[in-house]
Amino acid sequence: MSFAVVEGLARRFPRLSKEKVMIAAAEQSTSLNEIAFGDFLAQRSTGTEADAGLTDALSACSLAGIEVVSLLPGWVELRVPSDLAVISPLQELVAQLEAGLSPEVSEAISRAVREMLYNAVEYGGHFDPAALVEVKLIRLEHAFICRIKDPGDGFDPCTLDHAAINNPNDNPVRHASVREEKGLRGGGFGILLVRQLVDELVYNERHNEVQFVKYFSN
């Protein structure tokens, strides 16, 4: 293994020593994600119920094939397969990052993450596990930020006649009949719902990347 490779892996997992990176890469028996999980938990563990919850959440993410790109207190970056099976374990992780927030704020964040991730997996990744969705979760002192980028081509919001966000005022459920005609599953309230749940919601130009912010006071 070259020095450059070790340096690159060490930058990706800043909490791991180079010795751990080299051992993991050489043995190829334990993934760096698993070692990073263990190292992160060992440094923050106080033996509390919250630590046990985080351990379970991270283990569930690993089993679901979720790749950890960065794992720091208050900052988590993930690569997520476009598979509905990832939604539940990722929400468990989100719940750990919401520790100390009011039930109302926690519920709003969890629902928003779920809706945006579902859209990314369905419309961006087309339920193809090989298509990866990038997820960033950031917990600040008075805000929670979620950024999700899917591998799709994006969309034109003006053409989403199957989404509730474009229903005319005189027909607030028009999208339901459109979805039925197109053979789409029921729903279509995702973007509209998230706009009501969070304080800021913004897309990039292609509309294949979305960021929302939820503010709160401790």
Task: Set out the residue ranges of the language-model regions.
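Short beta->alpha linker loops
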Residues: S82-A85, R111, H207
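Helix-loop-beta hinge of the Bergerat
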Residues: L71-E104, I165
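Generic low-complexity, intrinsically disordered segments
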Residues: S2-A10, P14-S17, V21, A95
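Conserved ATP-binding N-box helix of the HATPase_c
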Residues: E104-P129
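Conserved beta-strand-loop-beta-strand hairpin that lines the nucleotide-binding pocket
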Residues: F13-R44, A52-E77, V121-N218
